[in-house]
Amino acid sequence: MIGWLEAMLRVGRKLFVKAETQLYPEEKPKLYPRSRGRIVLTRDPDGQERCVACNLCAVVCPVGCIDLTKAVADDGRWYPEHFRINFARCIFCGFCEEACPTSAIQLTPDFELGEWRRDALVYEKHDLLISGEGKVRGYRYWSVAGKAIDGKDKGEAEHESPPVDLRGLLP
């Protein structure tokens, strides 16, 4: 009988305390700076796509929700002909962002991806591309890469030494 009375007193005391429930759509939750949400593809400061279709993001993805195909532009740059992410399968782990050597793929704090149909959660390249540079400002991959493109040969990138002539090293 005393145990029952103690339990009722505990419940009675909590009865008049204000609840800590957040009313989600009206009150937005506090998001931390490193929170991981929707994936976007960013652009160079010049306005060109940063993605070089190296396929590292698709390889490192634990659920295999990224699909892309590489193409080569006239000036020698690589770009993704198609880039597709299935957000119905994505677990927002951030491995793709860490693996990207060009900082093209980035996770934003936007997490509201509710849809009525699953096929609406498959985003194509035109859905993922944003107009800005994202979190990494002023980075131009092709100006620091050791790959030859139109207007830049190997060894002419920023902070790059000229290539070594291996035949000149032979005795």
From Swiss-Prot:
One Pfam family cited in the UniProt record for this chain: Fer4_7
Organism: Rhodopseudomonas palustris (strain BisB5)
Lineage: Bacteria, Pseudomonadati, Pseudomonadota, Alphaproteobacteria, Hyphomicrobiales
Record field: catalytic activity: a quinone + NADH + 5 H(+)(in) = a quinol + NAD(+) + 4 H(+)(out)
InterPro entries per UniProt: 4Fe4S_Fe-S-bd, 4Fe4S_Fe_S_CS, NADH_quinone_OxRdtase_chainI
Chief localization: membrane
Compartment(s): Cell inner membrane
Protein name, per record: NADH-quinone oxidoreductase subunit I 1
Domain of life: Bacteria
Family label: Belongs to the complex I 23 kDa subunit family.
PROSITE patterns membership: 4FE4S_FER_1 (PS00198), 4FE4S_FER_2 (PS51379)
Cofactor or coenzyme needed: [4Fe-4S] cluster
Record's bilayer topology term: Peripheral membrane protein
GO molecular function: 4 iron, 4 sulfur cluster binding; iron ion binding; NADH:ubiquinone reductase (non-electrogenic) activity; quinone binding
